[in-house]
Amino acid sequence: FFEENIRNYEYDAIMEVAREALEYNDTVFINSPFTREVRTPGYMENLRQDLLKIGAELVVVWVQCDVEVCRQRMIARNSDRDTWKLENWDEYIKKINFTVPDGIKNLFLFNNSSDEAFKKSLDEAVKYFKNLK
């Protein structure tokens, strides 16, 4: 239902809010997977070019996580939105592409497979984003 009826509208709204926020601040973070868009040829480059027109720079943060860690976190989260995914894990996971996308300028890799990797990636992310200014 979500994929067919809500997703595209939700993502359009997220992008509109982000563009509006850029009018008031120089840094805007969007926390959405964009898993389809990140692999659509030209989508990220077109977005990058659109943002450059308003003086903004696109940085894509790709969160890496082991598949089993994802499953365990869904179990621990105990959310209704994960019920189908967990009950149909093999079918669900076949649809997810965990490989790092190719050809994206300003791609920051964030490893979230363990507490240690998360802390290290967080420190690196803070340094990375501070250096963009």
Regions found by a protein language model. Give the residues of each.
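Hydrophobic anchor at the start of a short beta-strand
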Residues: 28, 58, 107
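Conserved nucleotide-binding/hydrolysis micro-motifs of P-loop NTPases
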Residues: 34-35, 64-69, 114-115
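Glycine-rich phosphate-binding loop used to anchor ATP phosphates in small-molecule kinases
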Residues: 6-54
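Conserved beta-strand segments of the P-loop GTPase G domain that flank and frequently precede/overlap
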Residues: 31-32, 61-64, 109-111
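P-loop NTPase switch/communication element
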Residues: 1
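Conserved phosphate-donor/acceptor-positioning beta-strand/loop module used by diverse small-molecule
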Residues: 52-74
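Arginine/glycine-rich "motif VI" loop of SF2 helicases in the C-terminal RecA-like domain
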Residues: 50-56, 79-84
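Small-molecule kinase domains that catalyze NTP-dependent phosphoryl transfer to phosphate-bearing small molecules
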Residues: 76-123, 129-133
